[in-house]
């Protein structure tokens, strides 16, 4: 395993982390007596494999159902100074509820403290304002830190980049968890801002939200050859020193194996990556046109400023991936989450977009004339059965 300094925490963070939202029994709290021995045994095998390969950062959340309770059966048996434990708690206007949830997390984990507490889901400017308000959840997290129950405070986010940068600019957080990977590089400005504030940077879900890379289409496999799409994406992310760790949401012990193939390649990333990136970029241009690839995202409105709250940017992004890389299954899964993703994946589908007048909201786009047609086309291509967030399903 390789390790990187996790920003101003000074923790030596493994470049891969063991994410805790895939191995738990279910998404709702239930008594430990209801958890099958087979499921608990699988979780413990995952943690043991993680530690065996040097991944000593174990990440979970109060919102991950039985994850914390199940971890509490194994974590107290481990040398406390050899593991890094992170949990996350969603903020709200009731700080007493925030504290109650955190205390429940600590009780389930059977630990005296966590190394990292993430304020979970600073996804909008309103949530940020509420969190940072006098007497808000950030101040409550600081009290927990002063009481020795938390070592470092961070935040996790699915927010637009400007909200992430604004959160970083408070200089109140030691680290952040965010989305950034090859197919979604929008948040690079946030990573640069985090570097300026010496914050730890944890990449959320690079293999799932990064393209369902555990089940890639043959075309993407060919474009990423000789690496698998998963290893390519890992190497791409970790080739940037400002990125410190990638989450592996393991559902079974063998889920680490493919990721570990990245480690011996890290020193040669600058020689390996350019040819693959050139192929990927070239195929995007070949399928969609050079002008579109360079300018499609210019002048697009936010979903809040679009009739029917259509998330134009996300829909066109998914269309690009589906057409250029045959990432149909991934694009369908994300598209059909629109309307059910809340502030984690906001906005609506392009249903009946033909009946809407998008002229005003697309006035700044160089492709205003064709985007309505493309949205309708994408809806026909991707619409299907409604998808819910994992924690809601």
Which stretches of residues belong to each language-model region?
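Short beta->alpha linker loops
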Residues: 62, 66, 90, 158-159, ...
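N-terminal binding-site loop/beta-alpha segment at the start of enzyme catalytic domains
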Residues: 1-82, 364-393
């Amino acid at each position: 395993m390789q390790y990187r300094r996790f920003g101003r925490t000074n923790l030596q963070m493994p470049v891969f982390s063991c994410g805790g939202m895939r191995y738990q029994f279910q998404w709702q709290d239930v008594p430990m007596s209801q958890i099958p021995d087979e499921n608990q045994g699988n979780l413990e095998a995952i943690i043991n494999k993680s530690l065996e390969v040097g991944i000593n950062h174990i990440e979970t959340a109060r919102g991950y159902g039985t994850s914390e309770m199940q971890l509490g059966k194994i974590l107290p048996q481990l040398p406390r100074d050899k593991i890094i434990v992170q949990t996350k708690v969603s903020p709200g206007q009731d700080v007493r509820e925030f504290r109650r949830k955190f205390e429940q997390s600590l009780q389930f984990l059977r630990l005296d403290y966590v190394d990292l507490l993430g304020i979970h889901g600073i996804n909008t400017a309103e949530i940020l304002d509420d969190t940072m308000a006098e007497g808000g959840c950030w101040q409550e997290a600081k009290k927990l830190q002063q009481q020795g129950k938390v070592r470092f405070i961070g935040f996790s986010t699915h927010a637009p980049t400007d909200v992430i940068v604004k959160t970083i600019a408070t200089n109140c957080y030691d680290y952040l968890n965010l989305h950034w990977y090859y197919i979604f590089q929008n948040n690079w400005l946030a990573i640069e801002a985090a570097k300026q504030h010496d914050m730890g940077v944890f990449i959320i879900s690079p293999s799932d939200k990064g393209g369902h890379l555990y089940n890639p289409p043959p075309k993407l496999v060919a474009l990423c050859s000789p690496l698998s799409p998963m290893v390519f994406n890992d190497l791409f992310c970790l080739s940037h020193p400002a990125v410190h760790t990638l989450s592996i949401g393991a559902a079974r012990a063998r889920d680490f194996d493919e990721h570990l193939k990245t480690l011996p390649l890290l020193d040669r990333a600058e020689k390996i990556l350019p040819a693959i990136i050139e192929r990927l970029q070239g195929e995007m241009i070949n399928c969609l046109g050079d002008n579109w690839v360079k300018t499609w995202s210019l002048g697009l409105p936010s979903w809040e400023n679009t009739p029917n709250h259509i998330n134009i940017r996300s829909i066109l992004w998914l269309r690009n991936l589906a057409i250029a890389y045959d990432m149909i299954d991934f694009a369908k899964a994300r598209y059909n989450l629109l309307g059910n993703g809340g502030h984690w994946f906001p906005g609506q589908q392009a249903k009946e977009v033909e009946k809407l007048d998008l002229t005003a909201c697309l006035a700044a786009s160089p492709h205003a004339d064709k985007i309505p047609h493309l949205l309708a086309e994408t809806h026909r291509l991707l619409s299907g059965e409604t998808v819910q967030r994992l924690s809601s399903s």
